[in-house]
């Protein structure tokens, strides 16, 4: 089921970027991050036209949909002009209007055939428009964003949008997708324009110390070996039961994200105990969207890496679920409006270095790190270009000795309200233990088909 590349091109904005906007300065929070393309993948079946079975008609409709995607990009890029540019260096993006990198690919089998494969999720790397080589080496001249649209026999379609983490976070890419949808559906006037104030709120540092970067923080937790990803689906009923189980006097009404995070943390920590023979200090981290912490609130369409990591250190004791929820809630609450304000203005760099120093100290106290990133409530399952919502939304699966630091979990919504699909990335030997965890199996289904 190898995709055939039909075309590669650059799609340019419909209007030229003004001269005073040609250079987009990265903000201080962007400098803390690093370049790596992260993908959002949307899967659309051809079930909106149930009475059509003629291949010629199906191909015509799919061709129209593909053209709609391409023709609505230029106007979208005029608003999100850095997406059509290239990375200049660690300080700026050259908004040169060269265009967003766009790949069209085709698969001869159906989308249903893809979902019927064993471990299909670990084969979706075929839908991404970048090479692993672009994750290392020089970043100068790399596209800020890339898109691949893959069409399938009988009308299925997959859209993969990728963004460099040096430029922005998941909210940034999500905002672009929503604006693209508004343009495609002829509602461009209703689309909110991106807010590019981050570089003035969080002024960059021309000489930025390498030790104060997220990459350096994570170095102690990079592992060599074979990595695998598995998906664990928690349906609404299981989450309701789990929330009842983890509730306590400290956190009386835990969120579904907190409840699922606590369970996965304990199960992974139990897997480590089975591997090493005893509990070891573990650092639990959760990425926090700081736009909602600002006073006043920052616009949700604020571009950049407006996120920080909440850290909770778990020592050698046997972890209880309610205790883990309490630790996570306390850590997340520390990423508040005052913390965000401390990173702004002339004192922002010194305060960021102090925060990075504190995080580094926590990292040195832990033997392993479990990293959570929640994409829940992004609205990705509602991305409708005019032919219906996606049947599934995913990130990228892995299976092999790929560059990765282990123990990473991405939490995502499904098309059914209240569910969470957790993408878990571990060393294969750790995953083999986790898959057998009876407590996890009681609440979650592993690797279900979205069909």
From Swiss-Prot:
An example Gene Ontology molecular-function term: acyltransferase activity
Organism encoding this protein: Melia azedarach (Chinaberry tree)
Q: What is its EC number?
A: 2.1.1.-
Q: Which family does it belong to?
A: Belongs to the plant acyltransferase family.
Q: In which tissues is it expressed?
A: Mainly expressed in petioles and, to a lower extent, in roots.
Pathway assigned to this chain's UniProt record? Secondary metabolite biosynthesis; terpenoid biosynthesis
Report the PANTHER family cross-referenced here. F21J9.9, STEMMADENINE O-ACETYLTRANSFERASE-LIKE
What this chain does, per the entry, is described as:
Acetyltransferase involved in the biosynthesis of limonoids triterpene natural products such as azadirachtin, an antifeedant widely used as bioinsecticide, and possessing many medicinal applications including anti-tumoral, anti-malarial, anti-rheumatic, antibacterial, anti-inflammatory, anti-pyretic and diuretic effects. Catalyzes the formation of 7-acetyl-epi-neemfruitin B from epi-neemfruitin B.
Instruction: Tell me which Pfam families the record gives.
Output: Transferase
What EC class is this?
A: transferase
Q: Describe the reaction catalysed, as an equation.
A: epi-neemfruitin B + acetyl-CoA = 7-acetyl-epi-neemfruitin B + CoA
Q: Where is the signal peptide?
A: none
Q: Where is the active site?
A: 165, 384
User: What's the protein called, per UniProt?
Assistant: Epi-neemfruitin B 7-O-acetyltransferse L7AT
Keywords, alphabetical: Acyltransferase, Transferase
